[in-house]
Amino acid sequence: MDYSEIMVRHGELSTKGKNRMRFINKLKNNIQDVLAPFPAITVRSDRDRTHVSLNGTDYQPIVEALKLVFGVQALSPVYKLEKSVPLLVTAVQDIMTSLYRDGLTFKIATKRSDHAFELDSRELNSLLGGAVFEVLPNIQAQMKHPDVTLKVEIRDEAAYISYEEIKGAGGLPVGTSGKGMLMLSGGIDSPVAGYLALKRGLDIEVVHFASPPYTSPGALAKAQDLTRRLTRFGGNIQFIEVPFTEIQEEIKNKAPEAYLMTLTRRFMMRITDAIREQRKGLVIVNGESLGQVASQTLESMQAINAVTSTPIIRPVVTMDKLEIIEMAQAIDTFDISIQPFEDCCTIFAPDRPKTNPKLGNAEKYEECFDIDGLVQRAVSGIVVTEITPEIVNDEVENLIDALL
């Protein structure tokens, strides 16, 4: 027998009361986005489960993809069949025969939501357990902690049989907690921050600052590849490329070296906030970790935050660098993040950046800039690209090969 579908059990959605179906429908849409590279797949949801019909597709890559999607509590590859006692008996016998080894213990666990079915749960447990003993007389039944728990569900539309339960990612479906703008540089920290924001249901749009010719096409492709990795957790993500060359040159030419980073980050924050307002976001997300670098001291954060009243979420703010690296490796962004392309935060980095910048000094040094004009030109020049889970080719790898 081949698996018919993957049955997805919902996570925290059980706590969402009247909004439950809105959350479930969002999860369904996210699953469809994540599984877009598998065109034969179909997805449908009800109040208790989401059903991913395989339609001949190999189940293993589907399971690997679904394990990462936020909002999924657990999933099981299942056999779907008609609600017929003879068919159930044959299926249970075939499955247990294929799993059998010496000393194997098992139990049948039946759940019947279709109360019009001819047998109740206890009768089905007895009948199907007896059918297993007919073909495997040496097998042992064990009610507590058996090697195999064969789950049989009798639902209104069909019967389902499964024996594996695979842990999902948990969290909330992406998009159920509103929209935020993720400031993604291309380093290690910001993709991890994005991952953690996605886990709590935030629909992120990625804001990436590019300063050609100082930053290369490889840096842009790297940021897009990082964004693509994040799509595995909840579906398509809008990638917003911001032209930043003019602003960085202005800062380099007019500002004291010690304040280059502070003023650069203040402009980035202004632009991100303007994009957020334009695209109806609610928060800004970044990868700042307290005390990790000069721009991430409390004094620096205060001076940079002063340009906006928008809430700023810093998911990794209390994490050590090694903790962030471990998480980046776990979510498969680390190897991309360490690829050798400079970003806007490093190209003009001063040797001795100010670790305790004063807000008054930052505002004084900005008096020589046309702040509104610079921000407006940057926002009007943005390029928005939808990033999907499907990988056509790996542009960053190609660029690295060309450099070597």
From Swiss-Prot:
Enzymatic reactions: [ThiI sulfur-carrier protein]-S-sulfanyl-L-cysteine + a uridine in tRNA + 2 reduced [2Fe-2S]-[ferredoxin] + ATP + H(+) = [ThiI sulfur-carrier protein]-L-cysteine + a 4-thiouridine in tRNA + 2 oxidized [2Fe-2S]-[ferredoxin] + AMP + diphosphate; [ThiS sulfur-carrier protein]-C-terminal Gly-Gly-AMP + S-sulfanyl-L-cysteinyl-[cysteine desulfurase] + AH2 = [ThiS sulfur-carrier protein]-C-terminal-Gly-aminoethanethioate + L-cysteinyl-[cysteine desulfurase] + A + AMP + 2 H(+)
Pfam families: ThiI, ThiI_fer, THUMP
Cell cycle found in the keyword field: no
Listed Gene3D superfamilies: 3.30.2130.30, HUPs
Subcellular localization: Cytoplasm
Binding site for ATP: M183, L184, H208, F209, R265, G287, Q296
The protein's enzyme class: transferase
One example of a Gene Ontology biological process annotation: thiamine diphosphate biosynthetic process
The keyword Thylakoid appears for this protein: no
UniProt cross-references to SUPFAM superfamilies, sorted A to Z: Adenine nucleotide alpha hydrolases-like, THUMP domain-like
THUMP domain segment(s): 60-165
InterPro entries associated with the record: Rossmann-like_a/b/a_fold (IPR014729), ThiI_AANH (IPR020536), ThiI_fer (IPR054173), ThiI_N (IPR049961), THUMP_dom (IPR004114), THUMP_ThiI (IPR049962), tRNA_STrfase (IPR003720), tRNA_sulfurtransferase_ThiI (IPR050102)
EC number: 2.8.1.4
Pathway as given in its UniProt record: Cofactor biosynthesis; thiamine diphosphate biosynthesis
Keywords: ATP-binding, Cytoplasm, Nucleotide-binding, RNA-binding, Thiamine biosynthesis, Transferase, tRNA-binding
GO cellular component, one term: cytosol
GO MF assignments: ATP binding; CCA tRNA nucleotidyltransferase activity; tRNA binding; tRNA-uracil-4 sulfurtransferase activity
Top-level lineage group: Bacteria
Family per similarity comment: Belongs to the ThiI family.
Main function: Catalyzes the ATP-dependent transfer of a sulfur to tRNA to produce 4-thiouridine in position 8 of tRNAs, which functions as a near-UV photosensor. Also catalyzes the transfer of sulfur to the sulfur carrier protein ThiS, forming ThiS-thiocarboxylate. This is a step in the synthesis of thiazole, in the thiamine biosynthesis pathway. The sulfur is donated as persulfide by IscS.
Protein name: Probable tRNA sulfurtransferase
Species lineage: Bacteria, Bacillati, Bacillota, Bacilli, Lactobacillales
Record gene name: thiI
